[in-house]
A protein has these predicted regions:
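Helix-to-loop junction immediately C-terminal to a conserved catalytic motif
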Residues: 48
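Conserved ABC transporter NBD signature motif
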Residues: 56-67, 72
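Conserved ABC ATPase "signature" region
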Residues: 96, 106-121
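Conserved ABC ATPase signature
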Residues: 125-129
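Hydrophobic anchor residue at the start of the ABC signature
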Residues: 139
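Catalytic Walker B motif of ABC-type/P-loop ATPase nucleotide-binding domains
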Residues: 150-154
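H-loop/switch region of ABC-family ATPase nucleotide-binding domains
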Residues: 184-186
Length: 234
């Protein structure tokens, strides 16, 4: 479980993006929905520890994300929309580093690269990769160590069709096995069938709907109702 307790956040010299957020993210697939710029990606950055809240506390399975940083973050994996990678490092070097960081054998990194069809490109540096290949490399790093919480910002963006299918199957398998998967996406239709909860983000506040209709069409219609026509979901 990821828990936000009275969390507020603002970027430097800007108004608050999030105001006194109280939120619990349980096992299963949770969709974050809301208009552009409402704070969805910021929520993921806070939950991953990339950003520090101005006020409040974030806990992962009861562990404070900052006071108990190492054990709390071991169970987290974060896929940013725009990966910031060292341009002259190779994919293999990046995955080897992640394996050392998570105290896992390097073979686990090789397996993750294979899953994303990157094994033959492992010698290439980041600057030689397309944006889609860079995102696949970061996604591969997310698999190392078998985390229990996945924070995915636009997980299908810039991915080939066959990779998208693999990602959707992987997400489905992880949610069924008890992982918590949180997704931000402009295209949520592929995830609707797997979703067990939704969080709306509007004007810096959040509201969680923990019980969604089981039927696909009813679930999609419910989510569209939450969106109030302000942004497309299909």
């Amino acid at each position: 479980m990821i828990r936000f307790h009275n969390v507020s956040f603002s970027y430097e010299k800007e108004e608050k993006v999030l105001h006194s957020v109280n939120l619990e993210i349980q096992a299963g697939l949770t969709l974050l929905i809301g208009p552009n710029g409402c704070g969805k990606s910021t929520l993921l950055k806070l939950a991953s520890g990339v950003e520090i809240p101005d006020e409040g506390r974030i806990a992962v399975d009861g562990l404070d994300l900052w006071k108990e940083e190492v054990p709390a973050r071991k169970s987290l994996a974060y896929l940013p929309e725009h990966p910031d990678l060292t341009p002259y490092a190779s994919i293999r070097e990046i995955l080897d580093f992640v394996c050392r960081l998570r105290e896992r054998p390097v073979e686990e990194g090789k397996k993750a690269l294979g899953f994303f069809d990157l094994g033959h490109l492992s010698h290439r540096t980041v600057r030689e990769l397309s944006m889609g290949q860079r995102r696949r490399a970061v996604f591969a790093a997310c698999l190392v160590g078998k985390p229990e919480h996945f924070l995915l910002d636009e997980p299908l963006e810039a991915m080939d069709r066959h990779i998208q299918k693999e990602i959707l199957a992987w997400i489905g398998g992880n949610t069924r096995s008890g992982a918590a998967v949180v997704i931000v996406s402009h295209w949520i239709e592929p995830f609707v069938d797997m979703a067990s909860a939704a969080v709306t983000v509007h004007n810096g506040s959040t509201f969680c709907f923990e019980s969604l209709p089981p039927d696909y069409e009813k679930k999609l219609a419910f989510l569209e109702q939450l969106a109030e026509g302000e942004y497309p979901l299909r």
